[in-house]
Amino acid sequence: MSETITVNCPTCGKTVVWGEISPFRPFCSKRCQLIDLGEWAAEEKRIPSSGDLSESDDWSEEPKQ
């Protein structure tokens, strides 16, 4: 028999069963899922990078010839 895997909701910390019975996994609810999405949309969360490439001289919208 397989062991039940549980994780903590990243928003509120409640225990969530990792399986089809938890449609919002890893979140415990649609509310927690939307809170997390809002944090990403408001740029409160981000994936760390080694530097700011947006100001790089290597970026150009003109094709190289």
Swiss-Prot record:
Family: Belongs to the DNA gyrase inhibitor YacG family.
Function: Inhibits all the catalytic activities of DNA gyrase by preventing its interaction with DNA. Acts by binding directly to the C-terminal domain of GyrB, which probably disrupts DNA binding by the gyrase.
Pfam families found in the cross-reference section: YacG (PF03884)
Sequence positions that bind Zn(2+): C9, C12, C28, C32
Cofactor: Zn(2+)
Species of provenance: Escherichia coli (strain K12)
Key words, A-Z: Metal-binding, Zinc
Protein name: DNA gyrase inhibitor YacG
